[in-house]
Amino acid sequence: MNKRAIAGALLLGLSVLLLASCGSVSTLETKAVTQTTASEATAAEEQPYEQYRNATEKIKKPEEQQAEELKKVLQQLNPQYGKADELDFWWVTSPRCIENEAAGKSCIAPMLGILAPSADPVLFIAFNYIGGEYMDMDTVEIHTDEYKYTYSSGTFSMEVQKDKVTFQNSPDKMEETALRLATDDDIDMLVDILKSDEVLLRFEKFNTAKPIWEECTMPEEDKQAIADVLNAYYLYLNASEMARAKAIS
């Protein structure tokens, strides 16, 4: 990913969020699926994002516990510090997303923008296409077990960024990244991905008389990356300012 461009887009998104609320502009279609008659019970412990999303009232924890839990999650994600236009910030994504890029895999890369303990975190989604040549993509489709989500270029937070991925023993590949400021509907989409057995990603160039597209199965590592970033997002969102300060200091 073009880190300088992504960092600039994060700053732009953070500024936009301060000026106005962002509505959902994605499209959602129900797919025809066979209903299952029984659900499998799971003994797995709820992850932080599940606890906070499903909570009917605010979860109260001691400040030190908030700071400790948040710091632990952020350290796993290796936050990057940046500064531009006299505004400093942290941007956070999963190492699994970086590993996918290094392996030449197209993927979804969720990330956080953090300005200061006094400001809530901002969630972004990067759609990352990697191929033999540039596509000039303008549309991304995500197919889960039950739904299809479509994002066109008008819903992106910036122009699609182009970069190159180099390999030691194989030809270079071209990379295109579209970044989107996530809405509540997008968070629902990410959770839907986590619940799906298989997810298909389709990167498209449709604003042309000669459309082209590439599709692939979403890397399994993306699911853990999504869960990790959602955990950090909800832990930060629900922490006190002092707990946030201790976690990022």
Regions found by a protein language model. Give the residues of each.
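Bacterial N-terminal signal peptides that target proteins for export
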Residues: 1-10
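C-terminal motif of bacterial Sec signal peptides marking the signal peptidase cleavage site
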Residues: 18-21
